[in-house]
Amino acid sequence: MANELTWHDVLAEEKQQPYFLNTLQTVASERQSGVTIYPPQKDVFNAFRFTELGDVKVVILGQDPYHGPGQAHGLAFSVRPGIAIPPSLLNMYKELENTIPGFTRPNHGYLESWARQGVLLLNTVLTVRAGQAHSHASLGWETFTDKVISLINQHREGVVFLLWGSHAQKKGAIIDKQRHHVLKAPHPSPLSAHRGFFGCNHFVLANQWLEQRGETPIDWMPVLPAESE
């Protein structure tokens, strides 16, 4: 069955491509030369570690990892426990409060519980230099994450893609809308949230789609690992 395929099965070949090896080498060289790179090396591929290919139900595309200390840990929009909730995620919580009955905004921005339920929180670029947004945008990560999206498109069916902002929407242009459910809105950033992110109802619509397919909806209330045991 297609959904038994793992990331390792479908990405092993891609990870041997010269461009990908060059990307890893460039990042490793920068780290070795003393440049602070986020997220830490062990966290770069967490999106794939927490959400296996066969478990993907929803894809949320981010752009660049957070470039402040302690924020990025490999999941788009998410920050580690104890780190202030960034503005875009705060706006996501506001949309959830306004649309999901009983949702109360948590005091943290750690979204591992979403990832464990099948929400792939994928940044299109997987590393960044400290304090320098988009500093790794041309290293080859975009080619890799394009491949990831095309593999989900090819090997899975009925995945909900939440594409917020023009960058994500361009990135998602290859998705087959006959096989998958694509929802578009402005980015939740304070610069654009009022242009249609608020009121987009994407979290509700995603769950409705999953339920129609007989799948378990996402519990959008983020819980810290200790709370969920």
Curated annotation (Swiss-Prot):
The active site is at D64 (proton acceptor). PROSITE patterns: U_DNA_GLYCOSYLASE (PS00130). Disulfide bonds: none annotated. GO terms for biological process: base-excision repair, AP site formation via deaminated base removal. Its EC number is 3.2.2.27. The keyword tRNA processing does not apply. The keyword Hydrolase applies. It holds the Pfam family UDG. Keywords: Cytoplasm, DNA damage, DNA repair, Hydrolase. It catalyses: Hydrolyzes single-stranded DNA or mismatched double-stranded DNA and polynucleotides, releasing free uracil. GO terms for cellular component: cytoplasm. It is found in: Cytoplasm. GO terms for molecular function: uracil DNA N-glycosylase activity. Gene3D superfamilies: Uracil-DNA glycosylase-like domain. SMART domains: UDG (SM00986), UreE_C (SM00987). InterPro entries: UDG_fam1 (IPR002043), Ura-DNA_Glyclase_AS (IPR018085), Uracil-DNA_glycosylase-like (IPR005122), Uracil-DNA_glycosylase-like_sf (IPR036895). It comes from the Bacteria. Belongs to the uracil-DNA glycosylase (UDG) superfamily. UNG family. Excises uracil residues from the DNA which can arise as a result of misincorporation of dUMP residues by DNA polymerase or due to deamination of cytosine. Monomer. This is Uracil-DNA glycosylase. It comes from Escherichia coli (strain K12). The lineage of its organism: Bacteria, Pseudomonadati, Pseudomonadota, Gammaproteobacteria, Enterobacterales.
